[in-house]
């Protein structure tokens, strides 16, 4: 078995050299899915996984725009259309200087499995640019988004490819992108998700990823007749996912001790309550300031510069910042301090070594493709509402989100249950693979 896995990874690596993030994602899937493929005659010999790791389409383009000093700037734009076996391509756009082909291919590959897990008819894709919205004026961001969409619009559509937000792409950017698409196509359609509620968006969409990861963690705890009430939680990040994960943790009776950004983390031993969270939301979403400002208002809290929160004693850890933020040493620190549950809010925030340590010690660990699928799930519900030309209430959408996260958890249990442990990595990978693979087999070699 080891030889088959090694041979497969060698072949994929040969085709995708110098793409470490993508290979990391493929390796994690291959190690759990290939043994399953070999055990099933229907999949063995069909090269399905090899077909799944190859994008159906890779789009790369120049994005030229004019800054406030009337100087011409040039960035790169991308869209990876990974797999459309179960539905149109669906996945976010990321605007960040680190964006490259490897990162977007890893995100698109993960998205295929994540979208399959939601049970909604969505394929997988991802896109973005190395443009950095930080420090840019609203007008500069608008000009960039308009230039970006002027090329992207020809590749997307409500039944073809439906982008959404990601790091660096929030409500403001989605608005500018949608406005330009509407101008170019002269039509109002559900081509993007994450829209404002007054112009085709869904209630609960901004909260969905954060809420969803907490719902999933609660499902994990329920396996052992436990719950979130009274638990201490360390959360990284302070963007959309971290904010709403914090909000839902508070709703369910947990105590959130930390939040962070690229400058460091805050530790509030009294817990971040609703009032403090509102201040953080204003600080990050409106003023766009650093998390360190928090300790100026709440002097009992501590700010630790250039560090992450994984040395803090907690029951539950929810990494919500970015890929590979939690490494082996961080994982050791969490285990030493009594952490029993880790649920990924970001995409692949734990390194392979960290994940292996969690699995070896049999703590409850949820990979992002399962635990943070709430965002794309509600994106799918937004697409459904756009098709119906109808808006569901907050309660209806939240109820559907809870149900989807519960169904994802059940799928992980079905395929990931071992003798005395649930391997959620194995469960999520196999469950996602089976849905996509069955569709690919039915559609022939295309």
What are these regions (language model features)?
Residues 42-73:
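Structured beta-strand/loop patches that form or line metal/cofactor-binding pockets in enzymes
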Residues 61-122, 126, 130:
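Phosphate-interaction motifs
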Residues 96, 115-229:
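Glycine/serine-rich phosphate-binding loop and adjoining beta1-alpha1 elements at the start
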Residues 160-164, 187-192, 235, 258-261, ...:
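General beta-strand structural signal in soluble alpha/beta enzymes
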Residues 193-196, 201-311:
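Glycine-rich phosphate/diphosphate-binding loop of Rossmann-like nucleotide-binding domains
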Residues 264-365, 370:
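Rossmann-like adenosine-cofactor binding region
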């Amino acid at each position: 078995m080891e030889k088959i896995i090694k041979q497969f990874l060698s072949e994929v690596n040969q085709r995708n050299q110098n793409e470490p993030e993508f290979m990391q994602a493929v390796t994690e899937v291959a190690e759990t899915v290939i043994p399953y493929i070999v055990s099933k005659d229907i999949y063995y010999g069909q090269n399905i996984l090899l077909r799944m790791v190859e994008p159906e389409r890779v789009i790369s383009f120049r994005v030229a725009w004019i800054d406030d000093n009337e100087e011409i700037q040039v960035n790169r734009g991308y869209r990876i259309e990974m797999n459309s076996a179960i539905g149109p391509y669906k996945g976010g756009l990321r605007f960040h200087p680190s964006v490259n082909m490897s990162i977007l291919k890893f995100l698109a590959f993960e998205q295929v499995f994540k979208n399959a897990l939601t049970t909604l008819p969505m394929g997988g894709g991802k896109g973005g640019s190395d443009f950095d919205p930080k420090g840019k004026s609203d007008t500069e961001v608008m000009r960039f988004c308009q230039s970006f969409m002027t090329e992207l619009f020809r590749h997307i559509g409500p039944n073809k490819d439906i982008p959404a937000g990601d790091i660096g792409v929030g409500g403001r950017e989605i608005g500018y992108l949608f406005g330009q698409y509407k101008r170019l196509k002269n039509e109002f359609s559900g081509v993007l998700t994450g829209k404002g509620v007054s112009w085709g968006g869904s209630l609960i969409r901004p909260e969905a990823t954060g809420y969803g990861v907490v719902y999933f963690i609660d499902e994990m705890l329920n396996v052992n007749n436990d719950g979130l009430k009274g638990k201490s939680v360390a959360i990284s990040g302070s963007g959309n996912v971290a904010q709403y994960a914090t909000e839902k943790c508070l709703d369910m009776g947990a105590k959130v001790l930390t939040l962070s950004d690229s400058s460091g983390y805050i530790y509030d031993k009294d817990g971040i309550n609703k009032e403090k969270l509102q201040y953080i939301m204003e600080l990050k979403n409106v003023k766009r300031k650093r998390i360190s400002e928090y300790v100026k208002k709440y002097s009992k809290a501590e700010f630790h510069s250039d560090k992450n929160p994984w040395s803090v004693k907690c029951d539950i850890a929810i990494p919500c910042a970015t890929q590979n933020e939690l490494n082996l040493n961080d994982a050791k620190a969490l285990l030493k301090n009594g952490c029993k549950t880790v649920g990924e809010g970001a995409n692949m925030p734990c390194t392979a070594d960290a994940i292996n340590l969690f699995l070896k010690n049999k703590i409850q660990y949820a990979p992002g493709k399962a635990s943070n699928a709430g965002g794309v799930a509600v994106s799918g519900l937004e697409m459904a509402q756009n098709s119906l030309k109808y808006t569901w209430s907050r309660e209806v959408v939240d109820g559907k989100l809870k149900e989807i996260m519960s169904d994802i958890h059940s799928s992980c249990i079905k395929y990931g249950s071992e003798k005395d442990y649930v391997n959620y990595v194995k469960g999520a990978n196999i469950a996602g693979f089976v849905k996509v693979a069955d569709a690919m087999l039915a559609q022939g070699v295309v």
